[in-house]
């Protein structure tokens, strides 16, 4: 019997720190779904904890504020975006146009699905015009990096003005994010890959 007590004690000690982690994961998942669907400003802390089935103190033990939770959501969104973007590009080594087309072809499919609300980072930048807001900071950093990546890809394609082509591609992508929320299936977002090819070919002097 005496030998069971230490084992039981160890198990209890090991389980204790897992509880807030599980609560934090549930809060994070719930917040992501609600923030993306309804917008960050529209979703209150009470709604998040009710949906997640946790208490408000549980939320504040893991996240100091709703603003911090919003920033975490956007960092997760950023990581998911780059995971998808990089996978498309990596599938076409040495051919940046094909890699970009692969990403945009996937976007054109996602953009017409039910529940698609565009880019969570673009939406956050619109919701939070304040320059120093944590959500806007993450959104701006992401878009700056996307702009840089597109210009670098344009240079690899041999564009005479990589920055100009990169900016054109960025405008196309952002247009797809926004127009998808207006038109849905059959909207212009479905053509984003074809439009990108036309833009690239024009910049490279192809007929």
Labelled PLM ranges:
Residues 28, 74, 78, 136-144:
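Amphipathic, non-transmembrane alpha-helical scaffold segments
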Residues 66, 77-81, 92, 96, ...:
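Hydrophobic/aromatic residues within well-ordered alpha-helical segments
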Residues 2-3, 26, 30-68, 72:
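Helix-turn-helix
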Residues 70-77, 84:
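Alpha-helical DNA-contacting segments of helix-turn-helix folds
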Residues 72, 86-116, 162, 166-169:
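Hydrophobic alpha-helical connector segments
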Residues 1-22, 29, 204-207:
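N-terminal intrinsically disordered/low-complexity leader segments
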Residues 98-99, 113-134:
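Amphipathic alpha-helical segments used for helix-helix packing
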Residues 4, 134-141, 155-207:
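Hydrophobic/aromatic-rich alpha-helical bundle segments in the mid-to-C-terminal region
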């Amino acid at each position: 019997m005496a030998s069971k007590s230490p084992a039981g004690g160890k198990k209890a000690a090991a389980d204790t720190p897992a509880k807030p982690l599980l609560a934090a994961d549930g809060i994070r998942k719930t917040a992501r779904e609600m923030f993306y669907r309804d917008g960050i400003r529209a979703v209150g802390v009470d709604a998040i904890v009710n949906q997640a089935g946790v208490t408000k103190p549980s939320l504040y033990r893991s996240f100091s504020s709703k603003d911090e939770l919003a920033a975490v959501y956007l960092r997760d969104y950023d990581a998911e975006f780059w995971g998808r973007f990089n996978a498309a590009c990596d599938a076409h080594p040495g051919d940046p146009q094909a890699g970009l087309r692969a990403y945009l072809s996937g976007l054109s499919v996602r953009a017409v699905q039910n529940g698609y609300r565009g880019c969570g980072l673009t939406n956050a930048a619109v919701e939070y015009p304040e320059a120093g807001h944590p959500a806007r900071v993450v959104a701006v950093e992401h878009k700056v990096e996307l702009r840089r990546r597109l210009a670098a890809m344009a240079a690899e394609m041999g564009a005479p003005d990589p920055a100009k082509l990169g900016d054109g591609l960025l405008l196309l992508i952002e247009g797809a994010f926004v127009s998808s929320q207006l038109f849905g299936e059959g909207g212009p977002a479905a053509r984003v890959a074809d439009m990108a090819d036309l833009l690239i070919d024009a910049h490279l002097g192809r007929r």
